[in-house]
Amino acid sequence: MKIQDYTKEMVDEKSFIDMAYTLLNDKQTTMNLYDIIDEFKSLGGYEYEDIENRIVQFYTDLNTDGRFLNVGENLWGLRDWYSVDDIEEKIAPTIQKFDILDDEDEEDQNLKLLGDDDADEDDDIPAQTDDQETLDESDNDEDDVEMNEADIVIDEDEDEDIAEGEEEAFEDAEDFND
């Protein structure tokens, strides 16, 4: 059965991935993802909001279903249309090859390594910018005097005594729970 013969009920019941397989088989040519979705919208009389969730699932299925092949530029076709050699040549991602450095290359003073030219450009960046705070000892001394005058400071010894007392109370509570 051709995809144009589908009724709205059939479109509602059938998965988009199966309809895409039928559509691509009928057309015998690669199609853009958005053209496939537009075809489904027109067949089912859908608005985009009506099928938004189905589109997400459809895209996931397209990528995972072995029957389909992304041939670039968001064009999709059926894997059956391509030989293994075609897939390896045209579709498989190319790997950029680099020369391997040997001992002679490492001794060559004119050889620039990756990233060396970027390091020189970073030299003009200031170590400190205007929006960063500076922590001078003189400022801290003024703050210490101000806090002492306000009687806000807790002596370090008092702080340790409080912490030890809390630990003992916690240990007593643990013994009680056992």
UniProtKB/Swiss-Prot annotation:
Key word Transferase present: yes
GO molecular function: DNA-directed RNA polymerase activity
Swiss-Prot/TrEMBL GO biological process terms: DNA-templated transcription; regulation of DNA-templated transcription
Record-annotated HTH HARE-type domain positions: 14-81
Biased composition (Acidic residues): 116-178
Pfam families: HARE-HTH
One Gene Ontology cellular component: DNA-directed RNA polymerase complex
Keywords, in A-Z order: DNA-directed RNA polymerase, Nucleotidyltransferase, Transcription, Transferase
Disordered as annotated region, ranges: 114-178
Entry function: Participates in both the initiation and recycling phases of transcription. In the presence of the delta subunit, RNAP displays an increased specificity of transcription, a decreased affinity for nucleic acids, and an increased efficiency of RNA synthesis because of enhanced recycling.
Quaternary structure annotation from Swiss-Prot or TrEMBL: RNAP is composed of a core of 2 alpha, a beta and a beta' subunits. The core is associated with a delta subunit and one of several sigma factors.
Family according to the record: Belongs to the RpoE family.
Matching NCBIfam families: RNAP_delt_lowGC
Xref: HAMAP family: RNApol_bact_RpoE
Protein name from the UniProt record: Probable DNA-directed RNA polymerase subunit delta
Gene source species: Staphylococcus epidermidis (strain ATCC 35984 / DSM 28319 / BCRC 17069 / CCUG 31568 / BM 3577 / RP62A)
